[in-house]
């Protein structure tokens, strides 16, 4: 990773140690990051986390590897499913840097800036901020600004990472959010031309075990019992810490080819699609992205001890009115949905071949 100087922020004290802006970073058990020089070598930290919490992280490919590598060479827009708040983009950056010597620019929502050190950490990295939670007019202006910035990066052949949706899919039913795609394609050109200019290359992220599964199930019951329930800032921080520290088993990042040839073939066969309402055009592209991601899942076989694993996660959930039957089903659902979506994508592929 490359870290950049932040203007008007005092990072070092007189003894060349980090200021109090970074005191909360100890929550991540990285108290040895005492100086900026230490901070600049955060990549080894990602390796340490990988060794301690996984049985290996593998970079895999779906389809023509040479074509995927050509897409990367010319700058790719990596769009992934969203499993972990911190590590999805961090480990992808590590894998791409080790294999291809590139570092994608990373989009992150400002809703995660619960503490000052998180914002500073983000701005040190090759990150840009996706502003959320504003009024309708401000949201539109923010989207236009973001779209222009992304187009600028793409015009320079830079690679970019963004999750397919705002927030993680609690039930692991990974579907691209049309509003995210719309935000990326604001401009004077035709919608499909804007999508093609992005050069979207979907990436599938699969964890054998999700360390945040019990937290997600807990949130689903809280939301069920009180539809007005909203996460607090500290809930996201707790998810970050659990996601980083928790055991994940095997982890696979699978790169898939650019969706551009598929879009171009679709428009050749159906030129009338350019005249469809915007929400229909968005859904057509979202469906293509989803199929790529679903096809790229690594499907792990579950052994006889999986039921015991689910019960152990259920035991970690603390709620005053704990609905064990509901929570157990939500936990099973998280691990069932990727396999179901993978099978649906395979069926679609076989039907349309």
Regions found by a protein language model. Name each.
Residues 1-76, 82-93, 97, 119, ...:
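Membrane-anchoring hydrophobic helices of lipid-metabolizing enzymes
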Residues 51-55, 106, 137-141:
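Short, flexible loop segments at the rims of nucleotide/cofactor-binding pockets, characterized by
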Residues 77-79, 107, 129, 161-163:
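Structural motif
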Residues 83-85, 113-114, 135-138, 168-169:
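Glycine-/small-residue-rich active-site loops that bind phosphorylated ligands and cofactors
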Residues 87-89, 115-118, 171-172, 211:
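Short helix/loop capping segments that flank catalytic or ligand/cofactor-binding pockets
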Residues 96-104:
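A short alpha->loop->secondary-structure connector
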Residues 105-133, 140:
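Conserved nucleotide-cofactor-binding alpha/beta core module
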Residues 138-353:
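Non-catalytic C-terminal accessory region of glycerolipid acyltransferases
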């Amino acid at each position: 990773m490359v870290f950049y100087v932040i203007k008007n922020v005092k990072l070092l004290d007189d003894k060349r140690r980090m200021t109090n802006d970074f005191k909360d970073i100890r929550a991540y058990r990285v108290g040895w990051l005492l100086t900026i020089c230490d901070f600049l070598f955060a990549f080894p930290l990602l390796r340490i986390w990988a060794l301690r919490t996984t049985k290996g992280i593998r970079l895999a490919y779906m389809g023509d590897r040479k074509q995927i590598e050509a897409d990367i060479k010319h700058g790719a827009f990596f769009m992934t499913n969203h499993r972990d708040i911190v590590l999805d983009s961090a480990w992808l950056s590590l894998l791409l840097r080790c294999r291809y010597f590139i570092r994608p620019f990373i989009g992150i929502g400002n809703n995660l800036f619960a503490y000052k050190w998180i914002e500073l950490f983000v701005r040190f990295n090759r990150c840009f901020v996706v502003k959320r939670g504003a009024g309708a007019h401000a949201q539109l202006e923010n989207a236009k600004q973001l779209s222009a910035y992304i187009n600028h990066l793409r015009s320079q052949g830079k690679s970019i990472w963004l999750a397919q949706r705002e927030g993680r899919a609690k039930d692991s039913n990974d579907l691209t959010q049309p509003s995210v795609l719309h935000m990326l394609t604001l401009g004077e050109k035709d919608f499909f031309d804007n999508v093609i200019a992005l050069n979207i290359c979907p990436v599938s992220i699969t964890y054998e075990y999700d360390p945040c599964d019990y937290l997600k199930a807990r949130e689903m019951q809280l939301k069920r019992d009180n539809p007005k329930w909203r996460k607090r800032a500290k809930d996201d921080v707790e998810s970050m810490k659990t996601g980083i520290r928790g055991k994940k088993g095997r982890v696979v990042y699978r790169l898939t080819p650019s969706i551009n040839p598929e879009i171009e073939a679709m428009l050749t066969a159906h030129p009338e699609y350019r005249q469809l309402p915007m929400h229909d055009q968005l859904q057509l592209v979202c469906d293509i992205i989803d199929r790529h991601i679903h096809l790229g899942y690594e499907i792990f076989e579950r052994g006889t001890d999986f039921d015991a694993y689910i019960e152990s996660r259920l035991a970690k959930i603390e709620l005053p009115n704990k609905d064990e039957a509901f929570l157990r089903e939500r936990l099973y659902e998280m691990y069932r949905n990727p396999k179901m979506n993978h099978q649906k994508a395979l069926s679609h592929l076989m039907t349309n071949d």
